[in-house]
């Protein structure tokens, strides 16, 4: 019987700050489900510090300060180091060498057309002076994905162009040098509300600088305070006024987090979210009541995360060892892929006895 290709996941986050409920709804919760599904042979989770430096080169302390924060967030949401290999990107030198070889397979104009790159450049005001490392990061990402032979890459919809770039590099490499790299598939979130949660102020994106995030590590009191200050329908002034759902942050969060069990527990006069929405739209339902319900929903989700984090915070040496061992395993895996890439490109001169034989024959003729 023909051997099936191992199912391997690669995913990760930039350590530019603590992780928040947007990360949790958009990717972390799904990662834990995938990890525990038993469907995957290997899972690699990368703390992408080298990638974070592409737009934080003048502030490496920011990255250094958040390595452990992100690791603690991973462990607190249920990432299990016995099932998922957590590693630090900069400690896998093979990724840089792979990036260097892949750069020869992509044109500058192709990178410029990448919609994700264009959007990120605009967001960071890099239009006139784009750091080369930042401009190059779709190629770096292709190295990350292919180094671990990832078959599945769970990402948000906004990252689709990035994965398309990776697939193009894989196809180009394999067509030029022979079948070597694994062609990955994207795995999108199933719940559309999870694709990108807005900030609590209604802004399109949660951002540490805007102060509109709910962090996974925040206290119960701080979470409640932020929920009660959330942006809703500005025209819903009196309880009897009909309310709008579009752009109403509270309902966006309920879409992402609530289920019928929450209604039975905290708001039994409604069976499900559709009933609550209908009441809000026709009027007679106040924002405070809806916010209190959302607070209960979020506290139920975040309480075990806080408890696990408190335990890991008492054993930072243990977390350090998880990262160190994970990075060693990742480097071994990437080294094997790099060896195969160099063999395919025929630049493995000292590992290939045929090279010396060819040269001896050439110069003895």
Question: Which role does the model predict for each range below?
Answer:
Residues 19-28, 43-44, 49, 58-63, ...:
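Structured ligand/cofactor/substrate-binding pocket environments in proteins
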Residues 14, 51-52, 148-153, 211, ...:
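A broad detector of the eukaryotic-type serine/threonine protein kinase catalytic domain
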Residues 11-13, 88, 149, 199, ...:
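Pocket-edge structural micro-motifs
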Residues 1-5, 147, 340:
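Generic N-terminal leader/processing signal
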Residues 87, 153, 355:
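Residue-level "edge-of-site" marker
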Residues 2-143, 261, 300-302, 306, ...:
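N-terminal Rossmann-like or analogous alpha/beta NTP/dinucleotide-binding catalytic cores
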